[in-house]
A protein has these predicted regions:
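Hydrophobic alpha-helical membrane segments
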Residues: 1-275
Length: 275
C-alpha cells in the first residue's frame, strides 16, 4: 500500500511536466468557473425576481428543486469542460496537435452522454440530501459513505465518456469501476497529492483575502484581495487540469496497458504494484 501511495505522487509530479507543455489547457477550467458562476447568478436572480427566497428555506419542494438545479448545473458544466481537457490531453499523449477549441468540440459531440450523467448525479445528490434531512445523524453518515462510494465508482467516468462513447450509463459505470479497481492506490494518491502540492498556494490566497477583509484598508485591501483571489482561482484551475491529465493517463493504462503522458517517463513495474 505504501508503494502505491508513493507511486501516485510520482505520477502527480510527472503530470506537471505535461501541463507545462500545454499551459493553454488552463482556459478550459477557467471557462467552467465562469459558466457555473454565471448560471448560479442567473438562478439567484430568478429566485429573487419571483419572490422564492423565503420558500427556499421553508418549502421542501422548492428547496430540493433549487438543490437539484444547482447540482445539475455544476455537474453538467464541470463534466463538459473536464471532457474537453481529457480530449486535449489524450491527443497530446498521442503526439497530435490539439487546442482548447478541439476539446470543446469533442465535449459538444458528447453532450448527450454528459447531460445524462449530470441528471443522474444531480438526482443521486438530491436524494442523499433528502435522506440526510429526514434521518439526522444516520442520514449524514449514510450520505457521506454513499458520496464517497459514488465518487470512487465514477472516478474515471469523464475519460470513459470521451474515449469510449458507449452511450450506456451501466457500461460507463462498469468501465470506470473496473479501471479504478486496477489503479485504486495510484488514483487516490494522485487525487490527494495534487491538492496537497497546491495547498500552500491556496492557503496563501485565503490568508490574503482574510487580511484584506478584516484589517487592510484602501488600496492595500484591494491589492491583497485581488492577489488572494487570483491565487485561489489559479490553484482551482491548475488542480482541475492536473486531475484530468492524471485520470486520462491512468485510464489509458488501466484499459490498454499504455504508459502515456505523465506515465511515459516512469517505469510501469515501479509505478504499478500488484497487491
Amino acid at each position: 500500500m505504501r508503494d502505491r501511495y508513493r507511486n501516485g505522487l510520482a505520477v502527480v509530479d510527472a503530470s506537471l511536466d505535461v501541463f507545462r507543455a500545454r499551459p493553454g489547457l488552463a482556459i478550459l477550467p477557467l471557462l467552467s468557473l465562469i459558466a457555473v458562476g454565471s448560471a448560479y447568478a442567473a438562478v439567484g436572480v430568478a429566485i429573487l425576481h419571483y419572490g422564492l427566497l423565503g420558500a427556499v428555506f421553508t418549502n421542501d419542494l422548492v428547496r430540493y428543486g433549487a438543490m437539484f438545479a444547482g447540482l445539475a448545473i455544476s455537474s453538467s458544466v464541470g463534466v463538459f469542460f473536464n471532457a474537453a481537457v481529457v480530449h486535449c490531453a489524450s491527443r497530446q499523449f498521442d503526439g497530435k496537435e490539439t487546442s482548447a477549441r478541439d476539446g470543446l468540440a469533442a465535449a459538444w459531440d458528447a453532450r448527450r452522454e454528459i447531460a445524462k450523467w449530470s441528471l443522474v448525479s444531480a438526482t443521486i445528490g438530491t436524494l442523499l440530501y433528502v435522506a440526510e434531512d429526514n434521518a439526522p445523524g444516520v442520514g449524514t453518515l449514510t450520505r457521506s459513505i454513499l458520496n464517497l462510494g459514488w465518487g470512487l465508482l465514477t472516478f474515471f467516468v469523464v475519460p470513459v465518456i470521451v474515449t469510449d462513447r458507449t452511450g450506456s450509463l451501466r457500461s460507463e459505470l462498469r468501465k470506470s469501476g473496473d479501471a479504478f479497481a486496477r489503479t485504486w492506490g495510484e488514483s487516490i494518491t494522485a487525487a490527494f497529492g495534487i491538492g496537497l502540492a497546491l495547498f500552500p498556494v491556496t492557503l496563501a490566497g485565503i490568508c490574503m483575502l482574510v487580511v484584506a477583509y478584516v484589517s487592510a484598508t484602501g488600496l492595500t485591501a484591494y491589492g491583497l484581495g485581488a492577489l488572494g483571489g487570483l491565487l485561489v482561482v489559479a490553484t482551482l484551475v491548475v488542480t482541475q487540469v492536473l486531475g484530468m491529465i492524471v485520470r486520462t493517463a491512468l485510464y489509458r493504462y488501466a484499459t490498454d496497458g499504455e504508459c502515456v503522458g505523465p506515465l511515459a517517463e516512469l517505469d510501469p513495474e515501479e509505478v504499478f504494484v500488484d497487491d
